[in-house]
């Protein structure tokens, strides 16, 4: 969906940023599972040649990553309009005591998604 930024560019932009003020955007699509959780669809191949040669031998063109209840709610809230602080407040209202400490858990989860190139922050896109 979005162009990946290089390691040094991402690091430069986020060096002085407050994580709660960043606006996350998903880089991949998703599908809903039966229980209401989200399954993220990560493309198996990036290059056209490998996709053309190897894809016909495989069942699915995607690697499917299933998220738990909290992860699913946060993934759905990452719409590019809400910053992390707003998402934390929304999750606290939606899940109550089950999510506490909300800021720590959600920022750690989004940091992991960002490090695995599953999300990007709008502020990085503005700098490109």
Predicted regions and their residues:
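Intrinsically disordered, low-complexity serine/threonine- and proline-rich regulatory segments
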Residues: 39-40, 44-63
């Amino acid at each position: 969906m979005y162009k990946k930024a290089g390691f040094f560019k991402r690091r430069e932009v986020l060096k002085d940023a407050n994580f709660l003020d960043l606006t996350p955007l998903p880089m991949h699509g998703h599908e809903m599972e039966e229980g209401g959780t989200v399954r993220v669809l990560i493309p198996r191949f990036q290059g056209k040649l490998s996709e053309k040669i190897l894809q016909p031998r495989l069942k699915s063109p995607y690697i499917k990553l299933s998220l738990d209840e909290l992860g699913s709610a946060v993934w759905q809230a990452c719409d590019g309009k809400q910053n992390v602080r707003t998402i934390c407040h929304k999750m606290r209202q939606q899940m109550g005591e089950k999510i506490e400490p909300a800021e720590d858990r959600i920022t750690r989860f989004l940091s992991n998604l960002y490090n695995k190139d599953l999300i990007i922050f709008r502020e990085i896109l503005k700098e490109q």
